Amino acid sequence: MQYFEWHLPNDGKLWKQIKEDASHLRDIGVTAVWIPPAYKADEQQDEGYATYDLYDLGEFDQKGTIRTKYGTKDELKKMIDELHKYHIAVYLDVVLNHKAGGDFTEKFMVVEVDPKERTKALGEPFEIQGWTGYSFHGRKDKHSDFKWHWYHFSGTGFDDAQKRSGVFQIQGEGKAWSEGVDSENGNYDFLLCNDIDLD
């Protein structure tokens, strides 16, 4: 059962609500619950698809809040334990292909491409300033000390120096769009935030 929808309030109560509903879910025959992204997004009111920190489940003071839109890490763990008590599986929605809400800007070379034809460059390479630096200050290296930089991404959607949106393919050795996406309109997979380079 999907236990969320796009327009839930930003009140931090979803994990508590699901926990309180666990026995009822069992009684009506629910055997699995699909929950929204539990980690910190770029803003508290975000549904969780603008991924900021996969290691922050509502535990650290980052992006102006400790809890996520849905609650705290402790509430999440209690909710999962309660569902498991009633033999209900939990499926977590996770976004692994992009990051949002960088902590600092970096300068790097890009080529702007046609948003409707990603394989078509609109000019020569040039330098932009993008929000591609992730240091996760509030987490202080707990769970992971990995820091993200521009070279971990294949594209970005905003040049902070010019305050301009676009589809910017990051340049460098081995940098390219993913091959395995729909070829409609020339690699139609849309760019959201900072596209993680999975190659």
Residue ranges and their predicted role:
Residues M1-E20, D27-T31, P37-E75, M79-D199:
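Substrate-binding/active-site clefts of carbohydrate-active enzymes
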